[in-house]
Amino acid sequence: EKRVQHVLDEVELHSVSQQTIETLSKGFKRRVGLAQAIMHDPKVLILDEPTDGLDPNQKHHVRELIKNLARDKIVIISTHILEEVTAVCSRAIIISQGKIVADGTPAELEARSKYHQAVSVRLSEAYDLASDLSGLVDVGGVEQDSEDDRVFRILASDGNSIFSQVSEVAQAKHWPVTEFHVSRGQLEDVFRTVTQQTQGAE
C-alpha cells in the first residue's frame, strides 16, 4: 500500500486514481504504464517511444516524469523523436544495421553536425549575402532555404565560431536582418549522416 501511494505520487496519478484506464487521456495512460513499470522499483527502466502520439503538454509532463525517475534509476529510451534526446537524455547512442555508429552526449553529437556553429539569418527582403562572405576563411558555405529565399544558413568550417565575423559583415554591409542566431547543430543531420554511411558500406 505504501509503495502504491509512492508510485502514484511519483507519476502524478492521484487525481485520476479512481478512474478506469479506458476513461483516461493518452497522457494519463502513458503515466499508468510508467507506474506499472516502476512498481517494483527496478534499477533499470527501458522505455520504447515514451511520448509517441502525445500532444505538446502531455509530452512535457511525461518528459519531466522521466527526468525525475532518472535521478535514482538508469533510464534507457528507444526513440526516433530526436527532440526527445536533447530534452531528457544525458547520453545518446545511434544504432544502424545492429551496430553502434555514434555514442556521446547530445551536445557532443550535435557538434558533429555540419550545422554546428552555423549562423541562421532571416532577412526582410531578398539580398545576395553570399558574396559579402566570400573573404571569410572560416565560412564553409551558405545555404539558402528552398521555400523562403530570405532565409540563409551560413556554415562554419571545422566547427569554428563565426558569429562575430558574420555579425561584423552584416553591420558593415547593412543587411536587412530580422533574425540572427547560432545553431548548436542538428541531431537529425548527424543521424542521417552516420546511418547512411553504414548503409552505404554494405
Named regions from a protein language model:
Residues R31, V62-R63, A130, F163, ...:
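A general structural signal for well-ordered alpha-helical segments in protein cores
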Residues H60, D138-E143, P176-H181:
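A short linear hydrophobic-aromatic micro-motif
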Residues T23, D148-D149, G185:
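Positions that flank functional sites
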Residues S157-E202:
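C-terminal coupling/interaction segments
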Residues R63-S157:
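ABC transporter nucleotide-binding domain
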